[in-house]
Amino acid sequence: MKNVTDSFVSLGHWPSAGSFGFNTDILATNPINLSVVLGVLIFFGKGVLSDLLDNRKQRILNTIQNSEELRGGAIEQLEKARSRLRKVETEAEQFRVNGYSEIEREKLNLINSTYKTLEQLENYKNETIQFEQQRAINQVRQRVFQQVLRGALGTLNSCLNNELHLRTISANIGMLGTMKEITD
């Protein structure tokens, strides 16, 4: 503490200013010069420094504000993009579901129409088989009838002689006459 007070006391003892020149005593001149320079710098530089700091502060605030606005715009665009993405995903899901359901519906329609066609073909086949069976039965009947008729004619021709033939005709005429009398 004593050193500090001694330095202030030594400041009070100025050598007489008889001439202007360089003072080579660093300890005596530097604190005074430094205090004067610092005082002038603080007095005049305070406004300049304050203006520089205010300008810098304003630029930083403007940059922050612009960044916030850009950030807000980017967030808004991001939300719009997300919304569009959700909408497109929903539409894609609907198209996929509708496509699958349409495919399933077409598949069922195709299966049903194929089943109906097969059923119709089965019915047609059964009808054709029945028709062919009936036709074959009729042909067999005709052939059997023709063979029986030929056999009967052959038997009649071989068994019948003229006298038997005349008796059969007379008997038949007699039966017809009796039937006529009954009906009259």
Swiss-Prot record:
Chief location of this protein within or outside the cell: plastid
Topological type in the membrane: Single-pass membrane protein
GO molecular function: proton-transporting ATP synthase activity, rotational mechanism
InterPro entries, A to Z: ATP_synth_b/b'su_bac/chlpt
Record's keyword annotation contains Transport: yes
Pfam families for the chain: ATP-synt_B
Transmembrane regions listed in the UniProt entry: 27-49
Family: Belongs to the ATPase B chain family.
Miscellaneous comment as given in the Swiss-Prot or TrEMBL entry: In plastids the F-type ATPase is also known as CF(1)CF(0).
Subunit composition and interactions: F-type ATPases have 2 components, F(1) - the catalytic core - and F(0) - the membrane proton channel. F(1) has five subunits: alpha(3), beta(3), gamma(1), delta(1), epsilon(1). F(0) has four main subunits: a(1), b(1), b'(1) and c(10-14). The alpha and beta chains form an alternating ring which encloses part of the gamma chain. F(1) is attached to F(0) by a central stalk formed by the gamma and epsilon chains, while a peripheral stalk is formed by the delta, b and b' chains.
Record's function text: F(1)F(0) ATP synthase produces ATP from ADP in the presence of a proton or sodium gradient. F-type ATPases consist of two structural domains, F(1) containing the extramembraneous catalytic core and F(0) containing the membrane proton channel, linked together by a central stalk and a peripheral stalk. During catalysis, ATP synthesis in the catalytic domain of F(1) is coupled via a rotary mechanism of the central stalk subunits to proton translocation.
Protein name (database record): ATP synthase subunit b, chloroplastic
Source organism per UniProt: Nicotiana tomentosiformis
Lineage, highest ranks first: Eukaryota, Viridiplantae, Streptophyta, Embryophyta, Tracheophyta
